[in-house]
């Protein structure tokens, strides 16, 4: 229903709209604008609880720029929307530092933004599952956690591409190779589950042996920005498809092409945070690989034989680990280690 309503607004300049990683607007015979909007989700609650705001802006840039580059567009401009319960100058400055750092990493310009003060809309407390959090033993049920200043953060990005260089997934075919580029932890998805699951058991400032760090250090790792290595790939070889592994995780591969089968049979060992989540949540692999990135933040699909060049660009030029994680076959769906996700 929503898709139909949106499609009904499309004029002659719209090339691709609802459903892909970015909306595409023709601006002349050769070039298109790619437009995308996204937020950081409930990761902002963790930042509020920890009173640590310096990396959340990186997440906001990453969630937008990574999606635009998936269609072969170079992100060039960004605007942000920051809503706060009260105008805390120090907090706002820290958030803006992260946005500026993310913009530099993505090589784009922040050209505008909006600051909204919304005390009646943003809560100053959040419902949490009961448990040990804060070092106190609690009973079953729910408790409230208070924060000094709730906020929300979102943004929109514009990218530009040549029409003949768009990457929309139509050229993906059986025999192609799938290369996965490593993530930097959870990135910005699954935080509602993680917050209720882990903060009921651990304090944010508690060091967890399985992680080798405090919980807040792990949960506030910024989303990795893949713009520069992907643009290097696009400029040097024929890339058939790119998937940013966010909400929906590996099921998102079908967004690229629903007429082939994506077989992920060589996935790396998941990082410790995902093992910790699985242990406490007691959910199976199908659910994990449908919810979390499991250590792979971006999938790049190309002809067999190009995998070494893709991995070299990531490792040698951008210090990112990358692996061959699977292949494309005839059929339909997404499979991880023989488990069908969709």
Where are the model-predicted features located?
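Glycine-rich anion-binding loops of enzyme active sites
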Residues: 27, 32, 40-44, 59-60, ...
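Acidic-glycine-rich active-site phosphate/pyrophosphate-binding loop
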Residues: 28-41, 169, 204-205, 267-278
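Acidic, glycine-rich loop-and-beta core segments that form the ion-binding/anion-interacting portion
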Residues: 174-213, 217
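Alpha-helix C-terminal capping segments
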Residues: 66-74, 255-256, 302-303
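Glycine-/charge-enriched secondary-structure boundary and capping motifs
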Residues: 91-109, 115, 121-153, 201-220, ...
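N-terminal glycine-rich phosphate/pyrophosphate-binding loops that anchor nucleotide-derived ligands
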Residues: 1-69, 107, 118-121, 142-143, ...
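Glycine/charged-rich beta-loop-alpha catalytic/anionic-binding loops adjacent to active sites
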Residues: 39-52, 80, 210-214, 282
């Amino acid at each position: 229903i929503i898709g139909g309503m949106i499609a009904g607004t499309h004029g002659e300049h719209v090339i691709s709209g609802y459903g892909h990683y970015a909306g595409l607007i023709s601006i002349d015979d050769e070039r298109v604008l790619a437009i995308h909007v996204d937020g950081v989700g409930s990761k902002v609650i963790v930042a509020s609880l920890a009173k640590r705001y310096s990396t959340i802006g990186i997440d906001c840039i990453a969630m937008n720029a990574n999606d635009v580059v998936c269609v072969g567009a170079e992100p060039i401009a960004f605007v942000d929307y920051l809503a706060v319960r009260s105008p805390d100058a120090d907090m706002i400055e820290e958030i803006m530092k992260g946005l500026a750092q993310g913009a530099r990493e993505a090589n784009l310009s922040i050209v505008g933004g909006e600051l909204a003060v919304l005390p009646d809309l943003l809560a100053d407390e959040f419902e949490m599952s009961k448990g040990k959090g804060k070092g106190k033993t609690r009973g079953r049920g729910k408790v409230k956690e208070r924060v000094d200043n709730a906020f929300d953060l979102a943004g929109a990005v514009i990218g530009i591409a040549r029409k003949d260089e768009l990457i929309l997934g139509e050229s993906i075919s059986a025999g192609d190779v799938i290369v996965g580029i490593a993530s930097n932890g959870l990135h910005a998805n699954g935080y509602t589950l993680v917050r209720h699951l882990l903060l009921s058991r651990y304090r944010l400032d508690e060091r967890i042996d399985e992680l080798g760090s405090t919980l807040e250090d792990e949960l506030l790792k910024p989303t990795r920005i893949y713009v520069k290595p992907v643009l290097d790939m696009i400029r040097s070889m024929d890339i058939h498809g790119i998937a940013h592994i966010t909400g929906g995780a590996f099921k998102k591969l079908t967004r690229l092409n629903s007429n082939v089968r994506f077989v992920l049979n060589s996935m790396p060992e998941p990082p410790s945070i995902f093992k910790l989540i699985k242990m406490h949540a007691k959910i199976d692999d199908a659910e994990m690989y449908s919810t979390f990135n499991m250590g792979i933040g971006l999938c790049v699909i190309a002809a067999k034989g190009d995998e070494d060049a893709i991995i070299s660009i990531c490792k040698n030029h951008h210090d990112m680990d990358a692996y061959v994680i699977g292949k494309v076959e005839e059929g339909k769906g997404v499979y991880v280690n023989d488990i069908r996700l969709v």
